[in-house]
């Protein structure tokens, strides 16, 4: 699915709870994430 593709491609910071069908967004440090790209 699109969400899984975006997560594995590091486009969004999140994890998927496949049992409960919930997408948990990680609130990453935006400044740190910017410098890592």
From Swiss-Prot:
<comment type="similarity">
    <text>Belongs to the CSN1 family.</text>
</comment>
<dbReference type="GO" id="GO:0005737">
    <property type="term" value="C:cytoplasm"/>
</dbReference>
<keyword id="KW-0217">Developmental protein</keyword>
<keyword id="KW-0539">Nucleus</keyword>
<comment type="subunit">
    <text>Component of the CSN complex, probably composed of CSN1, CSN2, CSN3, CSN4, CSN5 (CSN5A or CSN5B), CSN6 (CSN6A or CSN6B), CSN7 and CSN8.</text>
</comment>
<dbReference type="GO" id="GO:0008180">
    <property type="term" value="C:COP9 signalosome"/>
</dbReference>
<keyword id="KW-0736">Signalosome</keyword>
<keyword id="KW-0963">Cytoplasm</keyword>
<protein>
    <recommendedName>
        <fullName>COP9 signalosome complex subunit 1</fullName>
    </recommendedName>
</protein>
<dbReference type="GO" id="GO:0009585">
    <property type="term" value="P:red, far-red light phototransduction"/>
</dbReference>
<keyword id="KW-0607">Phytochrome signaling pathway</keyword>
<comment type="function">
    <text>Component of the COP9 signalosome complex (CSN), a complex involved in various cellular and developmental processes such as photomorphogenesis and auxin and jasmonate responses. The CSN complex is an essential regulator of the ubiquitin (Ubl) conjugation pathway by mediating the deneddylation of the cullin subunits of SCF-type E3 ligase complexes, leading to decrease the Ubl ligase activity of SCF. It is involved in repression of photomorphogenesis in darkness by regulating the activity of COP1-containing Ubl ligase complexes.</text>
</comment>
């Amino acid at each position: 699915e699109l969400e899984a593709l975006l997560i594995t491609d590091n486009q969004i910071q999140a994890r998927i709870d496949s049992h409960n069908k919930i997408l948990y967004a990680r609130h990453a440090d935006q400044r740190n994430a910017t410098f890592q790209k």
